[in-house]
UniProtKB/Swiss-Prot annotation:
It is found in: Membrane. Keywords: Acetylation, Membrane, Transmembrane, Transmembrane helix. GO terms for cellular component: membrane. The keyword Transmembrane helix applies. The chain crosses the membrane at residues 15-35, 61-81, 95-115. The gene is TMEM254. The modification N-acetylalanine is found at residue 2. This is Transmembrane protein 254. It comes from the Eukaryota. Its main location: membrane. It is a multi-pass membrane protein. InterPro entries: TMEM254.
Length: 123
């Protein structure tokens, strides 16, 4: 059986990656739902590129947005499975892994994948 510390293992991810992901997803949300309010001319090279995507591929942007969230849901569910497989049995720790992976995706999941916890015996 896993140790008490291993059963409650949780590690917060890199602040750098969390900031990058938050800003990127925030910008993506802005582009998908409020494209008319974006100051394209003030965004440097990103402005004309974003405007082109909004004008010519808005449906693709919307579908990609929802697909990204669906992938985050899948990653979160996989994080729960990994927690159980690696001996992280604390409900609080599992919830933290689920939420962190839901909001930050692979940046969180790679930390959990790298964790070398005790594996539970399968019956």
């Amino acid at each position: 059986m896993a140790t008490a510390a291993g059963a409650a293992y949780f590690q917060r991810g890199s602040l750098f990656w969390f900031t990058v992901i938050t800003l990127s997803f925030g910008y993506y949300t802005w582009v998908v739902f409020w494209p008319q309010s974006i100051p394209y001319q003030n965004l440097g090279p990103l402005g004309p590129f974003t405007q082109y995507l909004v004008d010519h591929h808005h449906t693709l942007l919307c579908n990609g947005y929802w697909l990204a969230w669906l992938i985050h849901v899948g990653e979160s569910l996989y994080a729960i499975v990994l927690c159980k497989h690696k001996g992280i049995t604390s409900g609080r720790a599992q919830l933290l892994w689920f939420l962190q992976t839901f909001f930050f995706g692979i940046a969180s999941l790679t930390i959990l994948i790298a964790y070398k916890g005790k594996r539970q015996k399968q019956t």
